[in-house]
Amino acid sequence: MSYDRRRFLQLAGFGLGAATVSSMLGSCATRSTTKESPEFWKVGNFLPVDRETAATNLRVEGAIPPELNGLYVRNGPNDWQGSTEHFFLGDGMLHGVRLEQGRAQWYRARYVQTPILYKNPFMLLGPLMPEHNMSNVSLIQHGGRLLSLGEAGWPFEIDPDDLSTRQVFDFGGKLNTAMTAHPKIDPHTGMMHFFGYNVFRPYLTYHQADATGELVKSLPLETDGPAMMHDFAMTEHHVIFMELPVVFSMSKALTLDPFPFVWDADAVCRMGVLPKDGVAADMQWFDIPTCFIFHTMNAYEAGDSVIVDAARYDALW
């Protein structure tokens, strides 16, 4: 059965002021149920940071090359409550170090100031309201902006001087889908290539933003159904999408399941190759053995072939 966005909101019990749909991100792994094996994201080096912090004029052991200047910053989920069901969940926290002329000028840990900061992560609206995402996966610098990215939603612009959040960024109102947390920048043109997936048609949209950050192309693409797409690949002339058998489950979503996707071994498993300057009809799909892929590492062209290097799972569950 096909559902559009309005019908889904009605079935999920949404009103104008309601926000109670489950997250598009939940447990992708089996939870530990023994005291001897606590969830690894709650202990040790993965233990959540309990507050934002800042320090200046940091002590350096050894020497930092004076030519190494700039900002090193990372993003990741920080479960301030310490109760999340999966390590993918947790408000996005940025950790950054500013290096200048052999000195470590400052370190800061700052939350991405999203509309759902300090709220239950299972209330993430994802593709339904793209600004309501935890923005906790990665960052990219493009078009003079530093952007914090999440699994399903819009980016947030970050101030590189202090890691504060400037604004939600939707490319001047042009972006009408979520944005992947793994965009690719063409080193020859400066063009940023990315996609957004959705649980409603169009299930997949391919985007291009030029070197200045202007969104110049948004191309809806036909897929078999709503599938989870975390990453994609890019070569000099092509982009490669992966439609894999982790698919959206309306029945799970309506019961507020924290992860309304299921493994369906009978679903399509294929890669789609599209010329960067192509139209939807130019997509070529190639069936592959049943598997799931979170991340690609590299892609390139060799004669008439397109080669993709990726981490492959025989099954997600």
Tell what function each PLM region has.
Residues M1-R7:
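N-terminal secretory signal peptides
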Residues R7-A29:
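N-terminal export signals
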Residues S23-G62:
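C-terminal segment of N-terminal export signals and the immediately downstream linker at the start
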Residues P77-S83, L244-W263, Y313-W317:
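Short, conserved, GDST-rich strand-edge loop motifs in beta-rich repeat architectures
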Residues V112-K217:
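Well-ordered mid-protein domain cores that form the structural environment of catalytic cofactors
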Residues R201-H207, S249-S251, V268-R270, L316-W317:
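Structural motif
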Residues T205-A211, L256-G278:
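Beta-propeller blade signature
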Residues D266-W317:
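A conserved active-site cap/scaffold subdomain adjacent to cofactor or substrate pockets
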